[in-house]
Amino acid sequence: MSHTFYNSLDSSCKSPFGAIPAGQAVTFNLTVPEDLGYVDPHLVLTKDRENPVHYRMEFTGQTPRVNHFTLTVTPTTSGLYFYHFDLYTDFRRIYRTPGGEGVLSWTEGQEWQLTVYEPDFKTPDWLKNGTMYQIFPDRFCEGKPNKEMPFADRIYRADKTGEPYFWPTEQDEGYLNMDYYGGDFAGIQQKLPYLRDLGVTCIYLNPIFEAHANHRYNTADYLKADPLLGTNEEFSALCLAAAREGIRIILDGVFSHTGSDSRYFNREGRYGPGGAYRDRNSPYRSWYDFDSGYPCGYRSWWGFETLPEVQEDSPSYVDFICGKGGVIDTWLNLGASGFRLDVADELPDDFIEKIRTAVKSHGDDKLLLGEVWEDATTKEAFGQRRTYLRGRGLDAVMNYPFRNAALDYLHGGDVAAVADALMQICENYPAPALDCAMNFLSTHDTERAITAIAGEPCNGRDRCWQSKRCIPADKMDDAVRKLLLGYAMIFTLPGVPCVYYGDEIAMQGYRDPFNRAFFDWNSTEQRLRGPIKTLAALRRSCDAFDGGRLEIVRAEGDVLHYRRVGKTQTAEIILNRGPHLLAEEAFGKNTEVNPGGFTVLVEDNEPEHVGYFSVY
């Protein structure tokens, strides 16, 4: 392999950049060295799982020692397309290498990707320059203290700083998750001024429906708030109070399974004689797949008997979730601004499309976010390529690839590879989806950010090892500095940053349940709050962070320097994970970046408006 002929990240080679709506013309420009002799280059474009189409490129002229070719094509249908270039008379092809560059190859290589999405794909504008905040409801704030438990099998935790319970003998079914710290709607409402001051514009709540585990992913009643959190009316009051603070609330939609301990399945008998498990004539029977071939007699989520899977093609289930007066209708009418779909990969595309229709019937400003751990444009699940990020399904997804890239950078990984990972997502995702992608460093499903960044690697160790393990006190200064560097990254990349509750006070914890401790409202760790607040304010005031394109300026050594280009402003972000003071040029001037620090500089795009907007 030799010489670069094409770079998909360069607008002089491919225009426009990245994904395009169906009906949009896209132009490819190829340069071929003269010393290769006569060539007849073709673009080979293949729609996913279809036959390739060869397009002959047009010769447009010469510059010294280089021949130029061009081609414009207009994909008319949405889908996933892949392409490379054939030179034909040279019997070689041009394939993609890291960084989007093309090289000559005698053998097959990696193709470029072209995502084509629905031309009417729109996503909520209110989210795009905002800041999200994820709350695990039982563990944030108790507004009505010293509760009586609504069910006898719940354990009330008055010791708010105590570690969440786990019992090693219960590993077959995980563990009971029956200890409750009492977090509630009243507590969240009480802390709305705190969240507003932090710069939060959207709260993402983990499940709030009645359920019999503290995580509430085993839904018992979709139409009723868990009584420990409050009533449906109190949830509605919370949404109204949040709106007055400029904050919207989205909910977790767990629609791939219910709890076995639910009014729908009712294996445990808590809900009387009915339910699909106990009554063959139950109206919920068609929701589930009962078969003696399953170890427990029914299909369950990843084999957990307490989580029977639903059949998302059951008409009565679809109507219950998506129909008038159904789950989506009920909670959006109560004041929610959208849903995050749990395990979106495990929901059929047509079911997600019906959910979208139900959500958007309440207005285009309602959000539908999906849990996807990989590149959502190329994701395959159960033998099917998923189509949910092309404009008919999800608005956006959780941006795990960006989290992985941020952690790789903070752990000393190859910076060029980090930059390539970032640009691949920017290149593959439709702009409406990228602008709403949820960027984060930690969630309820991952280690706490500071633990993942600076803690001893878990490496699959059990919960006994994870219990009470923390970063040594003499390492905390460095850990906090790295955590802030990580947050600077996710606040300034395309997408919407999300702070997991407690990250702003450097809460620690390995995997579930240690990443779900109660928020320490007496914490003296306040070093992160100010910078996070400032970054959130910068996002709201600078249009470079509202859909501005990403350009990599330099990615080598310990330096990751990138640019966001908006309609009226441009921002340059310089991250320095290294131990030495860095001098870097931005906007034609030298600026210094502290060891382990970052700098954000902003200029107006108009020639008469020059100079730095802000420096951190």
Give each language-model segment a name.
Residues 1-131, 136, 142, 148, ...:
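Carbohydrate-interacting/catalytic domains
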Residues 30, 135, 195, 205, ...:
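Conserved, mostly hydrophobic/aromatic
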Residues 138, 382-383, 389, 435-471, ...:
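Aromatic/acidic polysaccharide-binding cleft in carbohydrate-active enzymes
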Residues 138-141, 209-210, 255-256, 337, ...:
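Short, solvent-exposed loop/turn segments at secondary-structure junctions
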Residues 239-248, 256-257, 262-273, 327, ...:
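Active-site-proximal helices and loops of the catalytic beta/alpha 8
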Residues 419, 423-425, 459-484, 541:
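Aromatic-anchored helix/helix-loop segment that forms the rim or "lid"
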